């Protein structure tokens, strides 16, 4: 399987300008002008014309409920699984699955099985061990053992704090989770990060900050998510990032509506504020929370209604960064490509350079929508339409 993308405007994520990219199997073999691959006709060479397109790394969604989530409004509010094309049609070639509120009917066995299924269908998958609950629900009985011995497991999450749905973990419990995740990661060469769900409580990131300040565990051990869920939390997140921490913003396809009922910070606005505050463009990511529930609670914590996160929010947020905030594309795509790859130690992901995995997106120049998606060297989407479907997805 040999593919050459000709004369695309390449963002690696750095802007390389117009050039060619050669894929051999599932790997990027070369980046440069006028590349050739002549096998005397023994191997089929597919050429894609990128002259009117932008080429970026495949998107990395670092927080998605791939097997579904939710349930805060009862059994009928359990959200559905992600299908393959839910991801690929939105440029996502690598996804990190997690479990949220429901750590009873959703469990690690099912999460890993779903991840492996998506992997067999053509994309790359990882998972966090655990859920909102503490003690952490694991597969092997040990969080450290899950991270060290299970290939797909790269950290713990999403552990909930500052939320009425959390287990209200003590400082000691939370510090132990971070310590065990850290050692599990060290022993296996993985990130071992703790993906921390942040709720609306005014305690915000207090537990994380206590661990960093009162123990030997560094900022890099944590990836707090949903930091844009309200204004006060986002202000604290800016300071956290200025001090060297990394933060994750949650995309929202329906932000125009949510801005009318709460003070959630629009991702593109948040990124502009981070940059203006002097935060490094290496220190933040965007994830979709796809297939996760978006429950609405009143001031008493009573359930009022529910929505669902969408994988499509990832690329939508990149577009808004460019189109609403005039953020250069080479910066706007870092939170969904090279940044999560570095933070999560996905060493072959997130960049366009020789030796990296053949995960690529071709975007239309005028509106940054999906034209072609390639995962591990295989063309999954072309002309905005899927070529590869999930096992039980309806064709056409």
Locations of regions flagged by a protein language model:
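Histidine-rich, glycine-flanked metal-binding segment
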Residues: 1-3, 10-56
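Divalent metal-coordination and catalytic microenvironments
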Residues: 8, 26, 52, 63, ...
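C-terminal cap of metal-dependent C-N hydrolases
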Residues: 25-28, 352-396
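Metal-associated gating/positioning segment near the N- to mid-region
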Residues: 42-45, 50-113
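Active-site gating loops and adjacent loop-to-helix segments of metal-dependent hydrolytic enzymes
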Residues: 70, 74-77, 81-97, 146-167, ...
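Divalent metal-dependent hydrolysis catalytic cores, especially in the metallo-beta-lactamase
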Residues: 82-135, 151-164, 186-201, 220-225
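Active-site core of metal-dependent hydrolases
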Residues: 179-295, 303-304
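His/Asp/Glu-enriched, well-ordered alpha-helical/loop segment
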Residues: 276-362
């Amino acid at each position: 399987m040999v593919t050459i993308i000709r004369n695309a405007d390449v963002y690696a994520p750095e802007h390389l300008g117009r050039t060619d990219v050669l894929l051999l199997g599932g790997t990027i073999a070369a980046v440069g002008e006028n590349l050739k691959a002549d096998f005397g006709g023994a191997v089929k060479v597919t050429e894609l014309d990128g002259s009117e397109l932008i080429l970026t790394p495949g998107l990395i969604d670092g927080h998605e409920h791939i097997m579904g989530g939710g349930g805060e409004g009862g059994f009928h509010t359990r959200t559905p699984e992600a299908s393959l094309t839910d991801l690929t049609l939105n440029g996502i070639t690598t996804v990190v699955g997690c479990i949220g509120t429901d750590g009873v009917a959703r469990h690690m066995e099912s999460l890993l099985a779903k991840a492996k299924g998506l992997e067999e269908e053509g994309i790359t998958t990882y998972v966090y061990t655990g859920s909102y609950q503490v003690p952490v629900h694991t597969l092997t009985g040990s969080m450290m053992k899950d991270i060290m011995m299970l290939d797909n497991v790269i950290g713990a999450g999403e552990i909930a704090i500052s939320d009425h749905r959390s287990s209200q973990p003590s400082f000691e419990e939370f510090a132990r989770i971070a310590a065990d995740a850290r050692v599990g990661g060290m022993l296996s060469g993985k990130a071992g990060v703790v993906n921390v769900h942040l709720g609306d409580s005014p305690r915000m990131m207090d537990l994380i900050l206590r661990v960093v300040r009162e123990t030997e565990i560094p900022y890099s051990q944590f990836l707090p998510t949903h930091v844009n869920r309200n204004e006060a939390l986002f202000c604290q997140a800016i300071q956290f990032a200025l001090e060297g921490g990394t933060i994750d913003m949650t995309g929202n396809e329906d932000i125009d509506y949510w801005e009318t009922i709460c003070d959630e910070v629009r991702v593109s606005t948040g990124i502009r504020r981070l940059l203006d505050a002097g935060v490094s463009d290496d220190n933040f990511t965007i994830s979709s929370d796809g297939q996760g529930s978006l429950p609405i609670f009143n001031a008493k914590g009573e359930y009022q209604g529910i929505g669902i996160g969408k994988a499509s929010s990832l690329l939508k947020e990149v577009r808004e960064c460019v189109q609403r905030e005039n953020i250069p594309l080479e910066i706007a795509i870092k939170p969904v490509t090279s940044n999560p790859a570095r933070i999560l130690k996905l060493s072959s992901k997130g960049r366009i350079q020789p030796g990296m995995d053949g995960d690529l997106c071709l975007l239309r120049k005028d509106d940054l929508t999906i034209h072609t998606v390639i995962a591990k060297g295989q063309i999954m989407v072309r002309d905005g339409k899927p070529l590869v479907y999930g096992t039980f997805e309806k064709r056409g």
